[in-house]
Every structure is written in structure tokens, then in C-alpha cells.
From Swiss-Prot:
Top EC category: transferase
Residues that bind 5-methyltetrahydropteroyltri-L-glutamate: R15, E16, F17, K18, K104, R493, C494, W539, E583
Residue positions binding L-methionine: I409, G410, S411, E462, D577
Protein name, entry field: 5-methyltetrahydropteroyltriglutamate--homocysteine methyltransferase
Keywords: Amino-acid biosynthesis, Metal-binding, Methionine biosynthesis, Methyltransferase, Repeat, Transferase, Zinc
List of catalytic residues: H672 (proton donor)
Organism of this sequence: Thermotoga maritima (strain ATCC 43589 / DSM 3109 / JCM 10099 / NBRC 100826 / MSB8)
Gene name, Swiss-Prot/TrEMBL: metE
């Protein structure tokens, strides 16, 4: 029995990766010093592997993103970056003004840079797999280089702004791409490499027979090399085609669902290759029941075990956590502990005897009363009392807003002063009273500024919040937050996913104090600001023994209690942010109806407000076409969307959907850019939307929250936005 592992987090126990990378960007350290820091992290990762598994991956420490590394390897550097000059060009592609687009890696919370393919000829530009292999070999460590496979690389790429996913688009490009991979693999083998770990997660996507024909051709071309092909995040789309590939070993994910297992039982597994069973969950931080997993491995007849998917979706180690709720720590395993589980599982399968940990969750942190409430929800819990047209009439009378009402999405700049005061409060250097007085002062300034600029619907600014999910996690029962449970989101940006470990309930109001204070300062409506249940769940870890639907409904009920408290306090508009509504959808579209049924119900349960309360939803993605029918079923009154990058073209989704009657907040300002948008640029977007929607349905707002921007960018941009709204009103009212 062999133990494999892959995708160990590169960030270091104390985010050493982030510090070194940002210091290098700021010019505080030289390239040589940066490389030294990276080498320390490389050794740390490999030492953890060496203690626990048999096959040690190399080429796993990317300086920004492993898909970007692959693009550089095969010479896919867009012309606008000029001649490739090492790290300076590499980081220009990642984060300069001309940077590549960034999007989610499959349905995970990791973001990758989308390669832009401008040519049909690839060539070997930089052989990082070989460099890394030789780095470890020089230290006497034999490794197996980890690479993104050619099919997945192309599947994740775009040409002229469109995905390269149709078989006829891929065929010629794959031929050229494979020649580069051949060259890379030849050089590795020439230098003594005995195994190459090729990652092909795209094999689990909705692929046609023509795709599998291409994949078979690719791997016939590469059949002379010692390849282990890894698939993960779901079951492979065509099991029989996949197991027929001429490779030495195949890794399947047996954690995400049971389809790979069912296919293996039905069709068997070929004798000419070995099965690597992905049985230790790489996406959730729970300890496994090793006896149960061992019996699955035996049932599979696997000759090797591994994690189900990359471990970089987990924090580095549990060792630094000292403040978790009682009984929780012993039920958890982060990346380092998952490696230890693999070692323990291998030892157990080889007949070694020892006490296995008890990981029973049966009655852990369960609130039976709350569970029963969720299980017995009446059907009308998921529908508002009146239909939208009736609600709209009531709300227009109550709010009396002008045409083209203006608002922002919620957060205002978190200045160094705000962050410093929060840090002081958390360290106990200032009292709760001092901190709350400071927050009140920030809210007062924000309300005064919005009044002066002339916005129609105001926000309190969210100065008391670090993160839109962590803020609520800290206030809800059944959710724990960590001290050092950092996970990489993209580049050097890390976040700490909360852990949903028990029944989720709301012990007391979470946002009432700040929102009602803000409302007391103005006659204009101030929005209540809440994060939706699907996003709280999607950006957290959650129990595997409780159905996802049930967890989402528990959170939704807690959010709905907050909505009701805000209504009671006289708040007329409540916004529920659901950026994860689309991204949590399964990879395979055949599973969408089941997911969207409970995701829609969860939002509607949270949003079940009085008819006179205007519910806003905020979703910041750029492609609504695929999910417009599901969005239409959500019980909001206004939805705000990102429209600036597409110059308003996103509205085509609503144009093609017959019967759209709800209001839309059009994002006219790309908040990811420091540039102040001109009135002309904003007007162009609104005019595009007016070709589709009547003027009565249009709101004007930025794309997203303004937390990461500076006040000197925010104020002129908001002034331009309000000036545009006034201009549009005059045009239509004259």
C-alpha cells in the first residue's frame, strides 16, 4: 500500500508566504531574498510530506497561481506584456493594470488567473517542474513533479474572451500543447524522474464523447511517461473512457459523491493500471472514521491511498488553535493532520494495531428544538405574503424615491485608522465603550457624507466588520472562528473560513445597534446589511453528517430573525448579499435543479419580510445567462449586479428572459479599479440597460462594496454617480 498526498498549503504556519510576497512587491526584499524565503517554505512542505507519505510532490509552490505557472511554461504570454522577463512579467500578468482575468477554480473558493491563448503554437518558455525537481534532487530528495494537465489547462483558458471548451476549438491547440508537455516530461525522465503527477480536474466536468476522444489522443501521445493522473471535486464524467487511458495510475475522488464507486463496482478497474483512492477529504476539516475508510479502500481494491482533492483548501495546521469551543478541536484535522491521517490509514491497512481516534458526531453541539423547527417549516415560510407587483406598489408609496435612485452596496473604506482601532480592541488595548464610540463616529461621518453627496438610500458603512461572513459567524451559535486557520484565496490574499460545527441559532440581534443608530441620523432610508445563508455556508466549513439543505435553512432562519428585528425598529430596506449563490452550484449541470431548489428556498426563508419592506439582493458575478431562471425565483424586490466591466452587456441575460419585472441596481463603477469613472462612462452603461428595461426598474450603484478603496477615489466617483442620476431624471421628466 502506497500513500500519496498533494496540494499541501504553501502559505506557511504563520502566513510566511504572504509576508515574503508582499515585502517583495513593496521592494523591501530583493529577488534573491524572496527566493530564499520561498525555498524555506518548499522545504517545510516537503518535510511534512516525507514524514507521512511515500510519494512526495514537487513544483507545488507557485509564486502566485499554478495555472499562471502553466501558461508561462507553455509560452502563453499575451502580446501586451512584451517579452517575458521573469518575475516582473509574471507579476504583471497577475496583478498589474493589464492583468489576466481572475475567476473561481471549479466550484472552490480558490481563484486562478485565466490564461489568454493568442496563438496556435505553444513552446517551452520556462521549465519550472524540472527546476523544482532538481532543487530537491540536489538535497537528496526524490520527488514527483505536480503539473496541471494539458486538457484541464486548455479547458480553463480563453481565446478572444471566450472559453476554449468546444472539441473542435480544442483539437489543434491540444496537438501543439502536448508537444510542450512531451518536452517537459522528457527532460524530467532524462534527469531521473520516476513519476509525474498530472492533475486533470476538468475530467469531472460535463464532457462529450468528442472531448474524451481528444483526451485519449493526448494521453496516447504521452503514454511513454510514468504518469499518475489525478481527478477530483466530483466523479469523472465518463468512467469507462477515463479508465481506458494509457497511463500508469489513476486517482479518483471517492469523497465528493458515490458515483465513482458505483461506476467502479459496475465496470471494474483495469488490471493494467493502479488505482489511487482519494479517500481523505481535502475540502472539509473533519477527522475521518479510519475504520470506515479502510473498509472502503479494501472494497475498492486500491493499491494506493490519497487525499480526495488538493489540501490547499484547508488551513496548514490545528496546532496553533487554542480558543475553539470545547470538544471541537479533537474532531478536526487541517492539512498537516490530514497527512498524519493518511499515514495512520496506511499503517492500519498494513495490519499495524493501535487505538483509532473516536470521531463520533452523533449528538455533538445539537440544539434539538432548533433542528425540529427547521425540519417542520410550513410551506409558506419560503414565500412572501404578497406577489412582487403588489409589494412594489406598497413600497413605492412608502419610500417615495425618485427615478434612478442611487445607493451603494454596503461597505465604505476600511482605512488604516479603522483597522488599527479594531486591532487595539481585539488585543484589549482599548475598552468596548471606546471602540463602539469610535465606530459610531465613523458611521456619523459616513451618513453626513452620503447626505452631502446626495445619495437616495444610505448605508452605515460596515466599519465594525472585518469580513462579511466572519462577522456573522462570530455572532451565531454553532459556528466557530479560528485564530490562524488561514486559507489562500488568490495571490497573497488569505481568509479564515469559519467552522459550522453545530446547530446554527441566533442568540441576540447582530446588526441592530449600528443600523438603527445610522437611521437615527437621517430622514433618508438606511439599508440593513446582511450576508445570505448560502454565502455564509459556502465560505465556511460545515458538518458532513448533516444535509446541506438543513444547515442552509438553520442559517436562513437566523438571518430572518434579524430581518424581523430590523423591520420592528423601523428599517424600511434590507439587503441580503449572496455572492456565492452561483459559485456553490455543482460542477455537473445535471445536479443543478436539486442544489438550486434548496438554495432558492434558503434565500427566500431569510428574505421572508413584510410586503412594505424592500428586500435587496446583491450578487457580484458577470454571467447571469446560465442562472437567470433561478434568480427569477428569489423573493427580492431589487437586485444589484456588476455591470461596469461588461459595459452593461450583462443585461442581455434579462433581455433574453421573458417576463422580468423586478428592479435592477446597475453597477456603473468597477470598484476593483482605482480609476474614478467619468459621467460619460457611467452613462454608456445605463443607456445600454435602458434599451432593455423601463426606466422605473433601474437603480444606479457601484458594482460592489467599497471596503478596499480609498476615500479620495470613493468621493469623486459617488459624486459622478449622483450627477448622472440627476441628469437622467431631468432627461426623462422634462
Amino acid at each position: 500500500m502506497k500513500a500519496y498526498a498533494f496540494g499541501f498549503p504553501k502559505i506557511g504556519e504563520k502566513r510566511e508566504f504572504k509576508k515574503a510576497l508582499e515585502d517583495f512587491w513593496k521592494g523591501k526584499i530583493t529577488e534573491e531574498q524572496f527566493e530564499e524565503e520561498m525555498n524555506k517554505l518548499r522545504m517545510y512542505m516537503v518535510e511534512n510530506y516525507r514524514k507521512n507519505v511515500d510519494v512526495i510532490p514537487s513544483n507545488e509552490l507557485s509564486y502566485y497561481d499554478f495555472v499562471l505557472d502553466t501558461a508561462v511554461m507553455v509560452g502563453a504570454v499575451p502580446e501586451r506584456f512584451g517579452e517575458y522577463r521573469g518575475l516582473s512579467t509574471y507579476f504583471d500578468m497577475a496583478r498589474g493594470g493589464k492583468a489576466l482575468e481572475m475567476t473561481k477554480f471549479f466550484n472552490t473558493n480558490y481563484h486562478y488567473l485565466v490564461p489568454e491563448i493568442e496563438t496556435e503554437e505553444f513552446y517551452l518558455l520556462e521549465n519550472k517542474p524540472l527546476e523544482d525537481y532538481l532543487f530537491f534532487k540536489s538535497k537528496g530528495i526524490e520527488t514527483a513533479p505536480w503539473v496541471i494537465g494539458p486538457f484541464t489547462f486548455l479547458y480553463l483558458s480563453k481565446r478572444n474572451g471566450e472559453w476554449i471548451r468546444r472539441p473542435n476549438q480544442m483539437e489543434k491547440l491540444l496537438e501543439s500543447l502536448v508537444s510542450v508537455y512531451k518536452e517537459v516530461f522528457e527532460k524530467l525522465v532524462e534527469n531521473g524522474c520516476k513519476e509525474i503527477l498530472v492533475n486533470e480536474p476538468a475530467f469531472v466536468c460535463d464532457l462529450e464523447k468528442a472531448h474524451w476522444d481528444l483526451i485519449l489522443n493526448v494521453y496516447r501521445e504521452l503514454s511513454e511517461f510514468p504518469l499518475t493522473v489525478f481527478t477530483y471535486y466530483d466523479s469523472v464524467s465518463d468512467y469507462e473512457a477515463c479508465v481506458s487511458l494509457p497511463v500508469k495510475r489513476l486517482h479518483f475522488d471517492f469523497v465528493s459523491n458515490e458515483e465513482n464507486l458505483k461506476n467502479l463496482e459496475k465496470h471494474g478497474f483495469p488490471e493494467d493500471k493502479k488505482l489511487v483512492a482519494g479517500v481523505i477529504n481535502g475540502r472539509q476539516p473533519w477527522k475521518v472514521d479510519l475504520r470506515k475508510v479502510a473498509s472502503l479502500v479494501e472494497k475498492l481494491g486500491a493499491s494506493a491511498i490519497s487525499n480526495s482533492c488538493p489540501l490547499f483548501h484547508l488551513p496548514v495546521t490545528l496546532e496553533l488553535e487554542n480558543n475553539l469551543p470545547g470538544g471541537l478541536k479533537e474532531k478536526l484535522a487541517f492539512a498537516k493532520e490530514k497527512l498524519e491521517e493518511l499515514k495512520m490509514l496506511k499503517d492500519f491497512l498494513e495490519g499495524k494495531t493501535f487505538d483509532l481516534p473516536n470521531v463520533s458526531f452523533e449528538d455533538f453541539a445539537v440544539d434539538l428544538q432548533a433542528v425540529e423547527r427547521v425540519r417542520n417549516l410550513p410551506e409558506d415560510s419560503f414565500r412572501r405574503e404578497k406577489e412582487y407587483t403588489e409589494r412594489d406598489r406598497i413600497q413605492r408609496e412608502r419610500l417615495n424615491l425618485p427615478l434612478f435612485p442611487t445607493t451603494t452596496i454596503g461597505s465604505f473604506p476600511q482605512t488604516p485608522e479603522v483597522r488599527k482601532m479594531r486591532s487595539k480592541y481585539r488585543k484589549g488595548e482599548i475598552s468596548k465603550e471606546e471602540y463602539e464610540a469610535f465606530i459610531k463616529e465613523q458611521i456619523k461621518k459616513a451618513i453626513e457624507l452620503q447626505e452631502e453627496i446626495g445619495l437616495d438610500v444610505l448605508v452605515h458603512g460596515e466599519f465594525e466588520r472585518t469580513d462579511m461572513v466572519e462577522f456573522f459567524a462570530e455572532k451565531l451559535n454553532g459556528i466557530a472562528t479560528t485564530q490562524n486557520g488561514w486559507v489562500l484565496s488568490y495571490g497573497s490574499r488569505c481568509y479564515r473560513p469559519p467552522i459550522i460545527y453545530g446547530t446554527v441559532t441566533r442568540p441576540e440581534p447582530m446588526t441592530l445597534k449600528e443600523i438603527t443608530y445610522a437611521q437615527s441620523l437621517t430622514e433618508k432610508p438606511v439599508k440593513g446589511m446582511l450576508t445570505g445563508p448560502v454565502t455564509i455556508m459556502s465560505w465556511s466549513y460545515y458538518r458532513e453528517d448533516i444535509p446541506e439543505r438543513e444547515i442552509a435553512y438553520q442559517i436562513a432562519l437566523a438571518i430572518n430573525e434579524e430581518v424581523k428585528d430590523l423591520e420592528e425598529a423601523g428599517i424600511k430596506i434590507v439587503q441580503i448579499d449572496e455572492p456565492a449563490f452561483r459559485e456553490k452550484a455543482p460542477i455537473k449541470k445535471s445536479k443543478w435543479p436539486e442544489y438550486f431548489e434548496w438554495a432558492i428556498n434558503a434565500f427566500n426563508l431569510a428574505a421572508n419580510a413584510r410586503p412594505e419592506t424592500q428586500i435587496h439582493a446583491h450578487m457580484c458575478y458577470s454571467d447571469f445567462n446560465e442562472i437567470i431562471e433561478y434568480i427569477h425565483q428569489l423573493e427580492f424586490d431589487v437586485i444589484s449586479i456588476e455591470a461596469s466591466r461588461s459595459k452593461g452587456e450583462i443585461i442581455s441575460a434579462f433581455e433574453n428572459f421573458k417576463g422580468w419585472i423586478k428592479q435592477i441596481g446597475v453597477g456603473v463603477w468597477d470598484i476593483h479599479s482605482p480609476a474614478v469613472p467619468s459621467i460619460n462612462e457611467m452613462r454608456e452603461i445605463v443607456e445600454r440597460v435602458l434599451r432593455v428595461l423601463p426606466k422605473e426598474l433601474i437603480w444606479i450603484n457601484p458594482d460592489c462594496g467599497l471596503k478596499t478603496r480609498n476615500w479620495d477615489e470613493v468621493i469623486p466617483s459617488l459624486r459622478n454617480m449622483v450627477a448622472l442620476a440627476k441628469e437622467m431624471r431631468e432627461k426623462f421628466e422634462s
